[in-house]
Each structure stands twice: as C-alpha cells, then as structure tokens.
C-alpha cells in the first residue's frame, strides 16, 4: 500500500482499533493490583529473540486476545527516571479493542503506573497507522511511536504521535535523531481526540516524515529542517503520566 509513499518498497504497519483510556483520571490504585514491576537499567531492559529482526508489513486488529508471539506487555521501571512504572496489568484486551490504563499507586518505587505494549522485532521506513481514542485528563500522554536507544546499541531515534490529556484538540508530532529532539509541533485537529475514534498515521522515508489525521496530511519534516531518524525502531503504544519534571509539558496529574 503506497498511497502517499515516495519509495518503491513502501511498507505499511497498521494497527486496528486501539482505544487508550485513563481509569477515572488517574484514580487510586486498588490494593489487589499485581506484584510490582522489576527495576531496570539500560543493560537489562526486556529483550527477546526477535530484537534485531526487521519486521515486515502487518495489519493487527486487537480483538480480545493477547498475541504474545508479536507483542510484549512492558513490566518494568527505571529507578532514576521521571517516567512511570510500566505494569502488564494495565494493558487490557477487550472484545473489540485494546485499552491502556494509567493509575496512581502508593509504593516505594513510583507514584504512577502506566500501560505499554511493544511490537516484537524492529521496524524501519514505511507507513505506521493507528485507529485510536486518546485518554482525557491533565497529566496523561497517549502515544504511538517508534523508538530505539543505547540499550539496543543504537542512537536514540524516535518518531512520535502523542496526545496530551490537558488539551486533546491538538496532536503532538515530534522526533529524535541521535538523542536530539527535533521538530516538536502541536497540530490543531478540529475535534477532541478523546470523544471518538480517528485514524492517525506517519510515513517515514529516509529523507522525510509525514504525519496524517484521517488520511489528511497535516505536517511534513524534511532534512533541510533537521536530520531524519535512520535507525530501525521498536513500535510502541502507551499511556502514561510523568513526574514533576513533566508537569510543565503534560500538565498536573488529575
């Protein structure tokens, strides 16, 4: 499928109905929650046998079942990071959708836990799509993105589609090349991304990135602006809320 591609071998990584939902806007965590996630450092992040395998085109419809062959629930935390703990118990597979949850928790290691799902293997140039409904609430961040980092022996390259719960009338397009953030822009949507499901996408070429909303081109990044990421990355879906250092960006958690 190469509706908007400019390179002949244009792959499509498409995900089906994907709903990001914050539970009662970061409600208190129930006491019966699953055991705490593991502490991780850069050398001991979750890995699998497909970690350096480049994946091919796929269309995945989340429909009530956890496909462990192709997906991995994150269940770890960084001890010295402003990011939350990632807990497998906050990734829910419903009959016709995936739901990710973020919650407050009273523990010694993190104040907030979020849900994250990773696609196994690595993916490169192509079109990435997600059909999703973002989570409302100040402090929440709903995202689909590609990512790699030093734990995989790579530079920090990343391409983001993000929604801040404090203002869901805008989409945040953003990317990193070799650890440097580039091209951060907030794109008006003309609707509230938490009210209904929409199709969001980006097309990643060696020399350009294009972002789409409901198949409408809304932003383009070119190397004349900043360097384009080149390293293959993991495909990630997550919902989170950060610590104090993130408040000026994402808002005060509800």
Language-model segment annotations:
Residues 3-4, 10-16, 27-254:
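GH16 jelly-roll
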């Amino acid at each position: 499928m190469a509706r908007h591609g400019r390179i002949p071998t244009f792959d499509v990584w498409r995900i089906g109905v994907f709903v990001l939902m914050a539970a009662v806007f970061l409600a208190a965590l129930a006491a019966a929650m699953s055991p705490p996630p593991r502490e991780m450092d850069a050398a001991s992040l979750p890995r699998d046998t497909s970690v350096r395998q480049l994946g091919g085109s796929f269309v995945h419809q989340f429909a009530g079942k956890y496909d462990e062959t192709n997906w991995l629930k994150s269940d770890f935390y960084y001890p010295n990071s402003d990011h939350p703990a990632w807990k497998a118990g906050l990734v829910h597979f419903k009959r016709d959708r995936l739901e990710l949850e973020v919650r407050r928790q009273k523990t010694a290691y993190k104040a907030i836990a979020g849900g994250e799902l990773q696609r196994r293997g690595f993916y490169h140039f192509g079109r990435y799509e997600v059909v999703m409904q973002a989570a409302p609430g100040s402090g929440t961040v709903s995202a689909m993105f590609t990512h790699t980092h030093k734990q995989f022996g790579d530079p920090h390259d990343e391409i983001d589609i993000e929604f801040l719960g404090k203002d869901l009338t805008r989409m945040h397009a953003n990317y990193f090349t070799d650890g440097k953030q580039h091209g951060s822009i907030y794109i008006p949507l003309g609707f509230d991304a938490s009210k209904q499901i929409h199709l969001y996408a980006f097309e990643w070429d060696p020399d350009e990135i294009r972002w789409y909303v409901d198949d409408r081109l809304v932003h383009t990044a070119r190397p004349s602006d900043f360097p384009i990421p080149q390293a293959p990355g993991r495909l990630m879906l997550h919902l989170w809320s950060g610590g104090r250092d993130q408040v000026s960006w994402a808002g005060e958690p509800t």
